[in-house]
């Protein structure tokens, strides 16, 4: 078959692996400049590939992006470089693994002032598993605080390369970019020439376009895809016509043919991003491939939280906003739920804490919806006395303790990288959070990698913030899910004057329930306003109350108008006031202010 377009041997597909803030998006800007994909004066925005406001502000990449560049090498040949930009954060590790599967090589970018971090190592292992050629790059060498040789030693210990294979660049100042471009062309292998095989294309990302429907970013692994071909998606068996195909250089460039080795996009009037799942394989209806590409899995949410509008008439607005967000984010799961305290809202499932924060922030920023979030929970498995297993992600669904045989909770294996002087602090945090310490490896004289196993429920809360504060910002963490284990968990209810408040209940470990209950009651005492009658705040497990605080009643002085006079007259007035308060207490409902629900989220402060 005659080659059309670029020869497969002239294509290089690569990605950049880096920790948050190590300069990945800035380096991508320099590569775009060096290949004249963008002139410097067009760089109105730094970090061209991070096109969401939130991505720029937090300095993170949330979605995968792809861009094609043409590079004229020193040997006079023209190469097509496809840079696939990957998210760096632990919550998005499945998206990262799919982006890596679309590449043949990876640039491992490490900050010369910070050294190797936990998420870099996690993504590096994914890249090595995918069989990628790794080019180590030390960035920010022009900063006065950089320690190039120290960082180079860490990289050599980590992946066993020679010192002369490690490149030194400064993305901001544009130092060393020429050598980097040559290394990409020389060291990263070309894709395999599988044009004669049946079509198999890997979807490594999908975005939603209001006019065109879902746009799938694809890497053609085998075969050839032509415009107007009829294609089938493996995950759901649905068939579509390829209305438009093409390559991505900052804007979409329509083409008539995409061949094995190419990276591009596919538009075929798909209404829902959930039909173009990340990791799925696309093949032709006429001459289909017999099996899909390896590595596809359905992403399961790990963290659950209730989202409620602050104004109850904003419910429809919240529903529409979630629908729009989920068009672009196939990993967001939500179902409507009601709460006696908060009214109508949604139970949402997220990949992890960062994902949850991003969704909340995007709802407030892009859609203008003010929301209250309930305590984040994980999914527990409850084995009933009858033998059946129930999955519970909301404390209010927890069955009565008499019917429960045992409860299992998800565990994660965590790697924490930090300076050696903070080991003691981190060990203490690990023990406080029911962590199981495994081992410590020294990366060099001053940095260590510590391994723990934690219940996910202890990590989703505020673990990352605590870790940063006890290590003065130096520690970084990465975790992966390892399965369910049996635990002694109880449901802790909060009662106001004997009435349970569903939005304040939580599932905690029995050993921590007393302390948690005490803290929660005293925190609520400071937040719930005083009433005309006494309010009892109780924390209870089942029918047993384990902690109590009392908000005393506001009292009017009924004796103020009695000057002297008979004691029985005074007693009568006081008794009458008591009666009134008793009646008030029976009919009165304690209004729980919104701060009370937020108080549960930061109970240690």
Curated annotation (Swiss-Prot):
GO BP term (any one): positive regulation of translation
Keyword annotations: Cell inner membrane, Cell membrane, GTP-binding, Hydrolase, Membrane, Nucleotide-binding, Protein biosynthesis
EC class name: hydrolase
InterPro entries hit by this protein: EF-4, EFG_III/V, EFG_V-like, EFTu-like_2, LepA_C_sf, LepA_CTD, LepA_IV, P-loop_NTPase
One Pfam family of this chain: EFG_C
Membrane topology, from the record: Peripheral membrane protein
Cell membrane listed as a keyword: yes
Location of the tr-type G domain: 9-192
Subcellular localization, as worded in the UniProt entry: Cell inner membrane
Gene Ontology molecular function, alphabetical: GTP binding; GTPase activity; ribosome binding; translation elongation factor activity
GO CC, any one term: plasma membrane
Binding residue positions for GTP: 21-26, 139-142
Reaction catalysed by this enzyme: GTP + H2O = GDP + phosphate + H(+)
EC number: 3.6.5.n1
SUPFAM superfamilies named among the record's database cross-references: EF-G C-terminal domain-like, P-loop containing nucleoside triphosphate hydrolases, Translation proteins
Function of the protein: Required for accurate and efficient protein synthesis under certain stress conditions. May act as a fidelity factor of the translation reaction, by catalyzing a one-codon backward translocation of tRNAs on improperly translocated ribosomes. Back-translocation proceeds from a post-translocation (POST) complex to a pre-translocation (PRE) complex, thus giving elongation factor G a second chance to translocate the tRNAs correctly. Binds to ribosomes in a GTP-dependent manner.
Family of the protein in this entry: Belongs to the TRAFAC class translation factor GTPase superfamily. Classic translation factor GTPase family. LepA subfamily.
PANTHER family recorded: TRANSLATION FACTOR GUF1 HOMOLOG, CHLOROPLASTIC, TRANSLATION FACTOR GUF1-RELATED
Name the record gives this protein: Elongation factor 4
Gene encoding the protein: lepA
């Amino acid at each position: 078959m005659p080659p059309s377009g670029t020869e497969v041997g002239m294509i290089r597909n690569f990605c950049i692996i880096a920790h948050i803030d190590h300069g990945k998006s800035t380096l991508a800007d320099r590569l775009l400049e060096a290949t004249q994909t963008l002139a410097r004066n067009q760089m109105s925005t730094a970090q061209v590939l991070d096109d969401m406001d939130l991505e720029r502000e937090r300095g993170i990449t949330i979605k995968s992006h792809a861009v094609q560049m043409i590079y004229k090498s020193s040997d006079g040949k023209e190469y097509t470089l496809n840079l696939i930009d990957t998210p760096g954060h632990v919550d998005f590790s499945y998206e990262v693994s799919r982006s890596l599967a679309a590449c043949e090589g990876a640039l491992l970018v490490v900050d010369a002032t910070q050294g190797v971090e936990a998420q870099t190592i996690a993504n590096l292992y994914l890249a090595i598993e995918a069989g990628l050629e790794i080019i180590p790059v030390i960035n920010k060498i022009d900063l006065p605080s950089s320690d190039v040789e120290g960082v180079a030693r860490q990289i050599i210990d980590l992946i066993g390369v020679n010192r002369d294979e490690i490149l030194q660049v400064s993305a901001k100042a544009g130092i060393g970019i020429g050598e980097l471009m040559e290394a990409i062309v020389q060291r990263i292998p070309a894709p395999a020439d599988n044009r004669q095989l049946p079509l198999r294309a890997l979807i490594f990302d999908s975005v939603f376009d209001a006019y065109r429907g879902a746009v799938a970013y694809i890497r053609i692994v085998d075969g050839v895809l032509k415009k107007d071909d009829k294609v089938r998606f493996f995950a759901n068996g649905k068939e579509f016509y390829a209305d438009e195909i093409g390559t991505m250089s900052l804007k979409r460039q329509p083409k008539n043919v995409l061949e094995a080795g190419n990276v591009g996009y596919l538009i075929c009037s798909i209404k829902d991003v959930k039909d173009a799942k990340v990791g799925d394989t696309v093949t032709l209806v006429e001459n289909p491939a017999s099996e899909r590409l390896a590595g596809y899995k359905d992403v399961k949410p790990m963290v659950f939280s209730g989202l409620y509008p602050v104004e109850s008439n904003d419910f429809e607005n919240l529903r529409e906003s979630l629908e729009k967000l989920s068009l672009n984010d196939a990993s967001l799961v939500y179902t409507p739920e009601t709460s006696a305290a908060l009214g109508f809202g949604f139970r949402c499932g997220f990949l992890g804490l960062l994902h949850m924060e991003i969704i909340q922030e995007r709802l407030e920023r892009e859609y203008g919806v003010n929301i209250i979030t309930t305590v984040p929970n994980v999914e527990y498995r409850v084995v009933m006395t009858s033998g059946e297993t129930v999955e519970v992600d909301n404390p209010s669904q927890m069955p009565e303790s008499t019917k429960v045989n045992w409860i299992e909770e998800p565990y994660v294996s965590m790697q924490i990288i930090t300076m050696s002087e903070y080991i003691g602090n981190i060990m203490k945090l690990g023990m406080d959070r029911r962590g199981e310490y495994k081992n410590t490896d020294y990366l060099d004289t001053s940095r260590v990698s510590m391994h723990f196993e934690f219940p996910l429920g202890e990590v989703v809360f505020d673990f990352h913030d605590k870790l940063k504060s006890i290590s003065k910002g130096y520690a970084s963490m990465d975790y992966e899910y390892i399965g369910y284990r049996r635990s002694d968990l109880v449901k802790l209810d909060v009662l106001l004057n004997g009435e349970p408040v569903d939005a304040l209940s939580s599932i905690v470990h029995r050993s921590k329930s007393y302390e948690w209950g005490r803290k929660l009651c005293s925190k609520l005492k400071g937040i719930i306003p005083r009433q005309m009658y006494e309010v009892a705040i109780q924390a209870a497990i089942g029918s047993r109350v384990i902690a109590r605080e009392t908000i005393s009643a506001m009292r009017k002085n009924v004796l103020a108008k009695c000057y002297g006079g008979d004691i029985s007259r005074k007693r009568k007035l006081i008794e009458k006031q008591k009666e009134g308060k008793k009646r008030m207490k029976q009919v009165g409902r304690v209004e729980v202010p919104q701060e009370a629900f937020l108080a549960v989220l930061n109970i240690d402060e």
